[in-house]
């Protein structure tokens, strides 16, 4: 059994590729079924966010394993293998465990130490449990990663400063608009990222917010908290002209805001500028919008420069966190190896007990037939001894014939010989 982590993220692939490799919530069950149907896969978890798509797998080692999994991923998304291969990373066993722990702790995020990723990893794990069989080692790896993430956040200052994609989007808005108290902000979506954006905006005295979402109930709960108006996605075209700032983060597989929609809004605004921050993957705003005069479009990748300015104080904490991850990953792999030994011990004990039971049954039968008790006990002891030492004796003889002193010493140690 081998543990694997493979995928792409914001460091290895541009948004144009990442959006083609995402797994939407609507198709996740189907994707998991397809993945677990692969003969080498024993268990799997799919993590798909704005900044990464990753597969965490428990697999049986086989020839061309990497090729088979890349082929599955490309076939599922109708991708050219060469396009994906150049951006794909592949981690195995200890490296896979360390990678997941780093991801869950926010150490591999676009925003170092951001807390949202832990919730996303937990959701990915929970989704994989719904009607899908998972390998126990994979489950244990995820549970351990959750506790490591908690330890990192508790024992270091990795989360001391409020830095996130949501925070960066608000920082960008403050850089472009002198005061946010007089602007109207349209938020598209009502997920966790938009919730954070809305709270940041409220803290910076934004008075007018509009939340557009597919389901009104979820949006209304957020609107009640921050004092916003709620509209449906179909109302965006009519209301876009009211917005000075648009920040969008949905799970839609297709763009929600098109070039024509923005052109009409700009015309109604008499070309007053609009800031559009698209932090969704796949993108919510057609890239062509950025070519329009007075429409200033930023994608999630464009936020990197803003985010970089807020990371200095987290670097020392990240070093401490990496030490924790290294230690915990090593302990997990020791546990995993011990599980393999435990299975061997169980098999050895079971085999010994079978030999004991077989010979004891024969001895009792001989006693019941009136045989000499002393002779029967001596015979039992002799046969039991020979049966138990037969396999180790053969191994010792073979090691001696091979001149394998290291194996001989291991066998001597295993048998408790001085």
Swiss-Prot record:
The record marks 99 as: Important for activity. NADP(+) binds at residues 189-194. Pathway: Porphyrin-containing compound metabolism; protoporphyrin-IX biosynthesis; 5-aminolevulinate from L-glutamyl-tRNA(Glu): step 1/2. Signal peptide: none annotated. PROSITE patterns: GLUTR (PS00747). It catalyses: (S)-4-amino-5-oxopentanoate + tRNA(Glu) + NADP(+) = L-glutamyl-tRNA(Glu) + NADPH + H(+). The keyword Oxidoreductase applies. InterPro entries: 4pyrrol_synth_GluRdtase, 4pyrrol_synth_GluRdtase_dimer, 4pyrrol_synth_GluRdtase_N, GluRdtase_CS, GluRdtase_dimer_dom_sf, GluRdtase_N_sf, NAD(P)-bd_dom_sf, Shikm_DH/Glu-tRNA_Rdtase. Its EC number is 1.2.1.70. GO terms for molecular function: glutamyl-tRNA reductase activity; NADP binding. Keywords: NADP, Oxidoreductase, Porphyrin biosynthesis. The active site is at 50 (nucleophile). It holds the Pfam family GlutR_N. Substrate binds at residues 49-52, 109, 114-116, 120. GO terms for biological process: protoporphyrinogen IX biosynthetic process from glutamate. Belongs to the glutamyl-tRNA reductase family. Possesses an unusual extended V-shaped dimeric structure with each monomer consisting of three distinct domains arranged along a curved 'spinal' alpha-helix. The N-terminal catalytic domain specifically recognizes the glutamate moiety of the substrate. The second domain is the NADPH-binding domain, and the third C-terminal domain is responsible for dimerization. During catalysis, the active site Cys acts as a nucleophile attacking the alpha-carbonyl group of tRNA-bound glutamate with the formation of a thioester intermediate between enzyme and glutamate, and the concomitant release of tRNA(Glu). The thioester intermediate is finally reduced by direct hydride transfer from NADPH, to form the product GSA. Homodimer. Catalyzes the NADPH-dependent reduction of glutamyl-tRNA(Glu) to glutamate 1-semialdehyde (GSA). This is Glutamyl-tRNA reductase.
């Amino acid at each position: 059994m081998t543990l694997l982590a493979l995928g792409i993220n914001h460091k290895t692939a541009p948004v144009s590729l990442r959006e083609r490799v995402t797994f939407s919530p609507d198709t996740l069950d189907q994707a998991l079924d397809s993945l677990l149907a692969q003969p080498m896969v024993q268990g799997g978890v799919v993590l798909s966010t704005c900044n990464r798509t990753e597969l965490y797998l428990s697999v049986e080692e086989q020839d061309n394993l990497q090729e088979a999994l890349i082929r599955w991923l490309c076939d599922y998304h109708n991708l050219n293998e060469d396009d994906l291969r150049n951006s794909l990373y592949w981690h195995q066993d200890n490296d896979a465990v360390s990678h997941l722990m780093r991801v869950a702790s926010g150490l591999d995020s676009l925003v170092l130490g951001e807390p949202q990723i832990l919730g996303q990893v937990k959701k990915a794990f929970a989704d994989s449990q719904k009607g899908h069989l998972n390998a126990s080692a994979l489950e244990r790896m995820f549970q351990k990663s959750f506790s490591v993430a908690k330890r990192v956040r508790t024992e270091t200052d990795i989360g001391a400063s409020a830095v996130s994609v949501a925070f960066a989007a608000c920082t960008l808005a403050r850089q472009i608009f002198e005061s946010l108290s007089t602007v109207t902000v349209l938020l598209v979506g009502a997920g966790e990222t938009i919730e954070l954006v809305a709270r940041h905006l409220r803290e910076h005295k934004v008075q007018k917010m509009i939340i557009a979402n597919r389901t009104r109930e979820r949006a209304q709960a957020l609107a009640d908290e921050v004092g916003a108006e709620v509209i449906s996605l179909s109302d965006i075209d009519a209301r876009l002209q009211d917005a000075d700032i648009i920040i969008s983060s949905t799970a839609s597989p297709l763009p929600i805001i098109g070039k024509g929609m923005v052109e009409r809004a700009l015309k109604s605004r008499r070309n007053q500028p609009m800031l559009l921050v698209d932090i969704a993957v796949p993108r919510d705003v057609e890239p062509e919008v950025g070519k329009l005069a007075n429409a200033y479009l930023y994608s999630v990748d464009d936020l990197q420069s803003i985010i970089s300015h807020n990371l200095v104080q987290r670097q020392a904490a990240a070093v401490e966190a990496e030490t924790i991850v290294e230690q915990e990953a090593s302990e997990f792999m020791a546990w995993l190896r011990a599980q393999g030994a435990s299975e061997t011990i169980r098999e050895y004990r079971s085999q010994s007990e079978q030999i004991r039971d077989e010979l004891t049954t024969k001895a009792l039968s001989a006693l019941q037939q009136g045989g000499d008790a002393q002779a029967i006990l001596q015979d039992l002891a002799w046969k039991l001894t020979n049966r138990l030492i037969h396999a180790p004796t053969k191994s010792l003889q073979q090691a001696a014939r091979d001149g394998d002193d290291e194996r001989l010493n291991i066998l001597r140690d295993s048998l408790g010989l001085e």
